[in-house]
Amino acid sequence: MRSHFTLLHLALSRMVRHGTLSVRYPDGTTRNYGQGEPAIGLEISTRRALRGMTFNPGLALGEGYMDGEIKPVGCSIYALLEFLIVNMTTGGAHPFERAREWWRWAKRRFDQINPAPRARRNVAHHYDLNGRLYAMFLDRDRQYSCAYFPTGNETLEEAQALKKRHIAAKLKLDRPDLEVLDIGSGWGGMALTLARDYGARVTGITLSTEQLEVARTRAAEAGLSDRVRFELMDYRAWDKPVDRIVSVGMFEHVGLVHYNRFFRMLRDTLREDGVALIHAIGRADGPGATNPWIAKYIFPGAYCPAVSEIMPAVEKSGLWATDIEILRLHYAQTIAHWRARFAGNRDAIASLTEERFCRMFEFYLAAVELIFRRWGHMNWQIQLTRQVDTLPLTRDYMLEAERTIIGRALGRTEIQGGAGEFISPDLAFQAISRSASNM
């Protein structure tokens, strides 16, 4: 144990440059690293946890917290993780972690080979959990992806409704009965919105049996079964032409080695005047590798790509990238809402699962919020067409589409004014709140 202590002691002595980290080791000794504020405490209570923190901290910190062998002292897990991230960014990463990061980078393409059976197992790992769990921290529509906060003052329900309208505007749903394919349709919220509010005919495909059952029930209860259907299907099995394709929060599960096939599938599926919109988590600091704890416990086989990693596949497919938008802190705000709701319902969630599971989810939500605030992650939305002239030459039509749906929600036929006119937050909130309350 002495050698493990020495190695971790040396790594922390080098890393901590901002604030003070007080570490209590398994032998009862306490060492302080750095100086000044903030002052953060950490207890490592077992030799196993100490060994893990020495040789594989990217995995061991989360596992130790789940098992109660690593605990924040005098602070929250969020505060501890933020402290460590800030110091890793400025003081340098743990030397063993740098070596493991290189190894993860070297084998990342192998880790992301996701044939259909493996993709199904990966999805079941996270999405086929007790549906009541997600109802306790997501919005009423169960949108498990980045919301859209134009002012930052929106409620979670408002921001998720705005996200769906923002995406719908980019799909240019300019006539009724457009056939839409929703890849990774989740609990059905996007598909139901496109059918109800835009007159589309939507097919949602998912690999989650739990989500499929909920989505079908919601469509029936909403009286939309004639316009929306949901299927248990891998995207690679789809072979029918459609007018529009939307995919929100699914692309992270495709895998690097499958990007060419994914975008070729989009091109082959879209009709000549078709439009696709892909919304996914990405990284602003270039290609990387998935954290080992996230890969093991939360999203096996998943990866959040930089835009530079997807564009070669887009270009090879022959599709036009007609619009790319980077959403920076929107997901951090989304997850902050989820964390607060999870904390408020923690006892009820524990009754459905177990304490270790609750700790896992607490660690997950805290860590993921922080990578969007501190560690270069963001969301990107990319709009794609087959033809160069499918869409107008400027983005004004998107604003007009969002203005139109706000007008409908307020019971008006239109909102007066030309393209580019500012819609007051109060007016938008009235519309979105009314819409969100009806979901």
Describe every region a protein language model picked out:
Residues P176-G184:
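Conserved class I S-adenosyl-L-methionine
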Residues A215-R216:
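Conserved SAM-binding loop
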Residues N260-E272:
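A short glycine-rich, Lys/Arg-flanked "PGG" loop and its adjoining helix->strand segment in the class I
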Residues D273-I281:
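Conserved beta-strand signature within the Rossmann-like core of class I S-adenosyl-L-methionine
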Residues I281-P392:
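Substrate-binding/catalytic lobe of Class I Rossmann-like enzymes that use SAM or dcSAM, i.e.
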